[in-house]
């Protein structure tokens, strides 16, 4: 059933997320812990929906219905639940053992997976067993609910518990279908990207996502409404919307009339923002250790010049932890300004502490690149450690790149570079949030200066005053900029 009432006009803000959001909702995903929690919600150690329903029936139902329902619970539902739990544990043990023999925690499942020895080793029987177990449990729960409501009008308490049972039935069906689709997709299914992932000890995830989302978005979303408005600070790449329209299916026939417009920023970036590009930084791919050390050193210099008020954005948790360890060990940094590190506290709490402190240093990864609004002088310096390219071996990214290459395209320049440009623009946009904000952005990835695609990435950024040179030269430029605006250390 639809959640929203009928509508003819659709407005999507932050529309640069549409493709990834569609992948999450049109694909299927299930985890071992998710199945475990679903079954435990029904009953575990005499707690859950079923024990509560049993107690409510004893207290409220007449004798005939009570005995019939309790007999169903005992004879069909409880054995089906135990069988489903055993089947789930067996299947995910097989998958955990399969991942244990792999070098990576994420394994993409191609056509060759159907011939893997794991099937002959018992995975096929385990998959069939789980499918049967979840289906049998679902049918038993439906029968129980129908027996209760067919012969009696339950009170509010029992009706609420039956609502939970119906929800569990839907989730059981979704889990069963997700496991089947990821491991053994039906013949004739559209191209899927499938993978298995280890997320921790005995925690396995399965996923299957349609490779081609553009036709689905067009048919299921855009063609069903009269008008669509897409807005975001980062929809255009290279001054056009071609990348977005191709990824979302907006260029598929039949064509629709539309207005495409890039609106000018209300901010005077040339006056409000200095954009520093050091040219003497080690390349992160060639010298990861040296680059990491330079990031920490520049972060300390930048914090000193701005007297705190620094965001440092990273593309990996490993790089973040490396920089955090160095900065925490420096009394001239951690002893002077509050050092806030993603993972040490919830995101909202870190942001609140950053705003309240007024002179803190915050180190963050993906979730801090966008959706963060800190106007005013609490944020006056932004350090971007590395260009935000997607990991090319991530299953969905790899499959999309392969599809582009197979059709004669250039996946790096047609897909990875535009995505990096959108992400970089989002990160850059954390700094200037009002007409009175001023600050400095430092990008510590020399590839933007040395590689051909660098000019494309820079062209998509706001028109801040740009300076290029050695870090020692740029540090003086930054100190002068802060001094001009009355910002800086007080030593």
Set out the residue ranges of the language-model regions:
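ASCE RecA-like P-loop NTPase motor cores
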Residues: 1-491
């Amino acid at each position: 059933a639809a959640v929203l009432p009928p509508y003819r006009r659709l407005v999507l803000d932050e529309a640069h997320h549409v493709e990834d959001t569609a992948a999450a909702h049109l694909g299927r995903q299930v985890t071992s812990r998710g199945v475990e929690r679903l079954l435990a919600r029904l009953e575990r150690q005499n707690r859950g929906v079923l024990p509560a329903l049993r107690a409510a029936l004893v207290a409220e139902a007449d004798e005939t219905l009570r005995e019939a329902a309790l007999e169903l619970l005992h004879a069909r539902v409880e054995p089906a639940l135990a069988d489903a739990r055993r089947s789930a544990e067996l299947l995910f043990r097989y998958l955990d053992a399969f991942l244990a023999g792999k070098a990576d925690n994420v394994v993409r499942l191609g056509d060759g997976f159907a011939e893997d020895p794991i099937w002959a080793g018992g995975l096929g029987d385990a998959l069939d067993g789980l499918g049967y177990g979840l289906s049998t449990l679902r049918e038993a729960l439906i029968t129980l609910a129908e027996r209760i409501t067919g012969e009696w009008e339950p009170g509010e308490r029992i009706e609420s518990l039956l609502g939970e049972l119906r929800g569990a039935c839907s989730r059981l069906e979704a889990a069963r279908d997700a496991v089947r689709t990821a491991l053994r997709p039906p013949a004739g299914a559209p191209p899927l990207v499938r993978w298995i992932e280890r997320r921790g000890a005995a925690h396995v995830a399965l996923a299957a996502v349609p490779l081609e989302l553009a036709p689905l978005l067009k048919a299921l979303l855009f063609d069903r409404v009269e008008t669509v408005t897409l807005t975001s600070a980062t929809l255009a790449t290279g001054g056009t919307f071609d990348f977005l329209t191709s990824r979302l299916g907006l260029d598929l026939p039949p064509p629709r009339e539309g207005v495409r417009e890039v609106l000018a920023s209300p901010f005077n970036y040339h006056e409000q923002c200095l954009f520093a590009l050091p040219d003497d930084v080690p390349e992160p791919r060639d010298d990861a250790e040296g680059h990491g050390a330079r990031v920490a050193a520049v972060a300390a210099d930048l914090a000193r010049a701005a007297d705190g008020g620094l965001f440092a954005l990273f593309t990996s948790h490993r790089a973040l932890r490396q920089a955090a360890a160095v900065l925490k060990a420096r009394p001239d940094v951690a002893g002077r300004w509050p050092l806030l590190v993603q993972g040490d506290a919830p995101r909202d709490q870190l942001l609140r502490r950053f705003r309240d402190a007024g002179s803190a240093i915050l180190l963050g990864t993906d979730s801090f690149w966008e959706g963060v609004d800190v106007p005013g002088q609490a944020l006056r310096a932004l350090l971007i450690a590395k260009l935000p390219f997607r990991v090319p071996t991530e299953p969905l990214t790899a499959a999309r790149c392969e599809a582009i290459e197979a059709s004669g395209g250039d996946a790096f320049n047609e897909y990875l570079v535009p995505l990096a440009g959108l992400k970089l623009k989002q990160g850059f946009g954390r700094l200037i949030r009002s007409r009175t904000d001023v600050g400095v952005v430092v990008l510590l990835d020399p590839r933007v200066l040395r590689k051909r695609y660098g000019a494309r990435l820079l062209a998509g950024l706001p028109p801040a005053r740009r300076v290029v040179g050695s870090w020692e030269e740029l540090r003086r430029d930054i100190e002068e900029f802060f001094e001009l605006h009355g910002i800086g250390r007080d030593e």
